[in-house]
């Protein structure tokens, strides 16, 4: 049984930027209120005509170019998203068509903000088992479409974007260890409860979140799974070069870093400029740090995140 490693990274952000000051013109809030509670200063918003697959395509093309491979070498496409183009088919199938890769196995993973670590773990298993050789793994979201823009508790938090990696076969370990978890008992704390029935949308079509409860659970669960992932991989905390966390809340990120004994200058933070982009946030942050030279080949990196469900997980890798 072989290994897998990341061959290339890519990302895409819509050009439209929505600042806290602009939001304050719409709802009762302020830049100070948002920054003090979340760390967010701005977020990117997709154009009205764009779909999740459009953002995914741009990130995928960048990752393929970064990997230095021909797109025809890709034999698996996984898209992590909670804002698909449509109910079905999968956004991965739509992306496959846009990439011009007919016949390549393609499917979506839905674990909300933990979607990318779930998708990357799945792609790693496919490659290690011989079911794929080169996988395109994408996290893409247009969260702005599921927000109630009159609810200041949630509309200030999220943004749109996409990030991607190409994962390929390797003789040396790249993905060192992955650990996933979920607990459906907490589904009511973070959800979008709408469904289609009888030709109509039934239920509330906007994101709902019990912020304090989510914060409390996230701090505890992320610290525990990050520690367990290192222990099960046999890697000391001191050997960890970078933490690339889901970009949800600066205080949650700081808590996990403190638990791991990492200074914040070893944590990739894109939250202030991008907000919470759900499944896209981890690959977006990873690509930023790869492109600016912070994350380099041979370094030990942990990716971790939590989303509605709750579902959470961590991936430890050598970049």
Curated annotation (Swiss-Prot):
Gene Ontology biological process: fatty acid biosynthetic process
Primary enzyme class: transferase
Principal location listed in the UniProt entry: cytoplasm
Signal sequence extent: none
Pathway given in the UniProt record: Lipid metabolism; fatty acid biosynthesis
Oxidoreductase found in the keyword field: no
Catalytic activity, as annotated: malonyl-[ACP] + acetyl-CoA + H(+) = 3-oxobutanoyl-[ACP] + CO2 + CoA
Family: Belongs to the thiolase-like superfamily. FabH family.
Protein name: Beta-ketoacyl-[acyl-carrier-protein] synthase III
Species: Chromobacterium violaceum (strain ATCC 12472 / DSM 30191 / JCM 1249 / CCUG 213 / NBRC 12614 / NCIMB 9131 / NCTC 9757 / MK)
């Amino acid at each position: 049984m072989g290994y897998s490693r990341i061959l290339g990274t890519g990302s895409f952000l819509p050009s439209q930027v929505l600042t806290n000051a602009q939001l304050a013109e719409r709802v009762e809030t302020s830049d100070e209120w948002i920054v003090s509670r979340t760390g967010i200063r701005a977020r990117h918003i997709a154009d009205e005509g764009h779909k999740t697959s459009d953002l995914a395509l741009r990130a995928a093309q960048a990752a393929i170019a970064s990997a230095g491979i021909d797109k025809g070498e890709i034999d698996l496409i996984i898209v992590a998203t909670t804002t698909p183009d449509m109910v079905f088919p999968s956004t991965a199938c739509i992306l496959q068509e846009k990439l011009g890769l007919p016949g390549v196995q393609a499917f979506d993973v839905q674990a909300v903000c933990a979607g990318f670590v779930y998708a990357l773990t799945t792609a790693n298993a496919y490659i290690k088992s011989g079911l794929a050789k080169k996988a395109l793994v994408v996290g893409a979201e247009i969260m702005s479409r599921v927000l109630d823009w009159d609810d200041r508790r949630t509309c200030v938090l999220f943004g749109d974007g996409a990030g991607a990696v190409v994962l390929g076969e390797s003789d040396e370990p790249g993905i060192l260890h992955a650990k996933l978890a979920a607990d459906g008992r907490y589904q009511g704390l973070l959800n979008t409860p709408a469904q289609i029935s009888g030709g109509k949308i039934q239920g509330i079509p906007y994101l709902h979140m019990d912020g304090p409860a989510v914060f409390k659970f996230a701090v505890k669960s992320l610290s525990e799974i990050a520690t367990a992932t290192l222990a099960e991989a046999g890697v000391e905390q001191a050997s960890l070069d970078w933490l690339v966390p889901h970009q949800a809340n600066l205080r949650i990120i700081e808590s996990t870093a403190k638990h791991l004994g990492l200074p914040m200058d070893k944590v990739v933070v894109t939250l202030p400029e991008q907000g919470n982009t759900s499944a896209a946030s981890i690959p977006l942050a990873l690509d930023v740090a790869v492109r600016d030279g912070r994350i380099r080949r041979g370094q030990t990196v942990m990716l971790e995140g939590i989303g509605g469900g709750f579902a959470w997980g961590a991936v430890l890798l050598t970049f």
